[in-house]
């Protein structure tokens, strides 16, 4: 789950393609479809938090963040969120989180591959495994 705040705008997306990209500095890559509204909030210099969900606790946030929301509706209303050192959102169900800053963007067909440097992170639940979301098809979201 990629969560972000930019001024008063908060957003979330389920990231299917996340990968470690570098050791020094620590970095990751995320693929974002060009037609996603969140893409405009992941420009060079923008920050975000990658919330890594637990296999035990991923179903509720998955339901919450994949349902349609009205424009401007707060997806986090009623949630007991915390903030990273860069003031990005951590949800209560997170197993771990990474606070990152976008450094590069590469155009790849109908997606952007975003490279971000990891600035901070923490493991919140060391007794659980990472959730894996299996899609019925990789042809669309």
Whereabouts are the PLM-identified features?
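Basic, polyanion-binding surface patches
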Residues: 1-141
